[in-house]
Amino acid sequence: MKALTVISFVAVALIALTVPVAAQGQLNDADREFVNKAAIGNVAEIELGRVATQRAARPSVRSFAERMVTDHGENNAELTTLARSKGIDVSSTLDTTHQAMRDRLSGLSGADFDRAYMSEMVRDHTEDVALFEREAQSASDADVKAYAARSLPTLRGHLALARQVNSEVTLGPTVVPSAMAAAVIVPWCQGAYAPTAGTNFGNCAPAK
């Protein structure tokens, strides 16, 4: 009888130890869907950016595309590590929608390419910011929530820059006084704030 009691105690202890570990590696459906969408978005920005570095006419469009390849590549590496820790294998290939966009862009060049690519970048990043804002507020998993919050400043910077370059390719460059140049280059720094030199998107400091 005593032996059975000891065995039962050990079994209960093992269950108590293993259940939390398993739970830590699981995501609810909403968080899992977010991780998958974020991965698809990263792959799309990387692949479309690579096309743009080869086919864009304006230097500003090529520069934007290079930034997308770099930033989304770094973000996707972080996301892939997070996903694996949660038992998820994220996609590393384009989804049907973005594959069709890639095929379309590959058939364009010059000003036509610039307009089509930048229009897509504004649309994609508008959706990305909304998606990440929701997850940063409502994610159930703490790690996923933190990842979404960390990514937001860069995504907001991408959206602001995409809008700026898109305006340039559709309407032409805007000429402004030199004193306003910083605000145009980094329009997401608002009010009494100015861009911090040598920092990534989304970093602002009080203006001196």
Report residues per predicted region:
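His/Met- and acidic-residue-enriched segments that coordinate or traffic transition-metal cofactors
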Residues: A3-F9, A16-K208
